[in-house]
């Protein structure tokens, strides 16, 4: 029986990237829909669950993507509400690659630092979907997490979302210019940049002298890079006693994780792969390679 993936994309054009990765992960056919709204979800999901017997439904799965994570979360909630036993299929949410990117960064940090309980983490520009999910996962690891934002109200809104979504407690601080970096970096062991492409967030002089710093991860792949001194293809390189990862260093693992998760969707018919479940897949991959 063919493995069928239903791609629900909130953007007008379904992601070609996601389709290519899904085929590489073992999907036999992909049914792609773009511009999917909340009102479309029920009938599309019904088309998945009522066409094969319950014992065969693990061969059908749903992928939710698009450029807007908030829209993706709404589609996921509606898709879950449409399913009922025994008519269920596995679903994965990864709008704009936010879940797999955040998880890949978190697992690389875990590999480097080990136990994160009580360790001080600073996430620059942590108000976007990647920063929020990384913050939530690291806080669930027991880390003392602070996110930064240029606008205090935006940071507070993100903090409230993270705390509610992941049942954790993170902090938010405003970072309007680099002059505040020395104070923000004081005692930090983990530095993660999830800021906008092409914007340098941290000059090398600001982080290279932080004696407590153990790992720095920059998810910006567009020059100028977000953390000066971290190269885009760095993968566990050592710079001044600090282990560093660039966007491609994280991205290579992210793509492998993406494929592994799509493959996992076809192993059973009741999986929901959101940030936490994707993190468990990634941690399993990390352990397997040691």
Q: What function would you assign to each model-found segment?
A:
Residues 111-190:
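Glycine-rich phosphate/diphosphate-binding loop of Rossmann-like nucleotide-binding domains
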